[in-house]
Curated annotation (Swiss-Prot):
Its main location: virion. The keyword Transmembrane applies. Keywords: Host membrane, Membrane, Transmembrane, Transmembrane helix, Virion. GO terms for cellular component: host cell membrane; membrane; virion component. The chain crosses the membrane at residues 180-200. It is found in: Virion; Host membrane. It is a single-pass membrane protein. The keyword Membrane applies. This is Uncharacterized protein L701.
Length: 203
């Protein structure tokens, strides 16, 4: 059973549309638990993505599926001629031919591309069936394959917030309290003692 990668977040229930994005996004189609057979597509910029079976190849499922979106890797999303060599993504490793399973066996979600000749659909997964049923057909009429790489940005990576060193407040706070106590109680007490001594001496 496949499990949806945490790069994806639910964007629409079946029959609705995911919000319009100004850039293409990674789309996934899965059950409400993000499990079972998962289908992948790339969305188009500035165009609503309809969440239904037709958008993913007229799939028929026993449960109502939902749509999930995530970020496409920037270098893939903005890919120019330098991203490919003979239509194959540079620096990516072939993991399967069409109609086989891409399984890099690294026990973590990786970047996977399915397609040929510079036309690819993206997924983030541990493994995935490498076929047009799962990815659609990004390049009709030619034999396709799957390629993988480790994500450039670790999945679930949250940039750490710099912590500004602080001086322990104990001494400083204690010092402030000492002066406060002196002003509130010490000086009046000294005045009271002085007055008592003055009246005793006067008698």
């Amino acid at each position: 059973m496949s499990t949806l990668s945490p790069i994806y977040s639910r964007c629409a229930t079946q029959g609705n549309s995911c919000p319009v994005s100004t850039i293409p996004e990674a789309m996934a189609y899965a059950d409400p638990n993000g499990t079972g057979t998962i289908y992948y597509r790339n969305s188009e910029a500035n165009k609503a993505f309809t969440c239904n079976n037709a958008s993913f190849g007229n799939q028929t499922n026993s449960t109502a599926y939902q749509c999930y979106n995530g970020n496409l890797p920037t270098d893939f999303r903005t890919a120019g001629s330098s991203f490919y060599e003979n239509g194959i993504p540079k620096g990516w490793t072939k993991c399967s031919d069409e109609n086989e399973t891409c399984d890099p066996k690294v026990n973590s979600d990786v970047d996977i591309l399915f397609g040929a000749d510079g036309s690819y659909v993206y997924s983030s997964a541990k493994s995935v069936p490498c076929n047009i049923n799962i990815f659609g057909d990004p390049k009709q009429g030619v034999k396709k394959a799957c390629y993988w790489r480790s994500p450039l940005i670790p999945i679930n990576h949250t940039p750490s917030t710099p912590v500004t060193p602080t001086t322990p407040s104990g001494t400083q706070t204690t010092g402030h309290k000492w002066w406060v106590y002196l002003l509130l109680f010490g000086i009046p007490l000294l005045i009271l003692i002085f007055l008592i001594i003055f009246f005793i001496a006067k008698k």
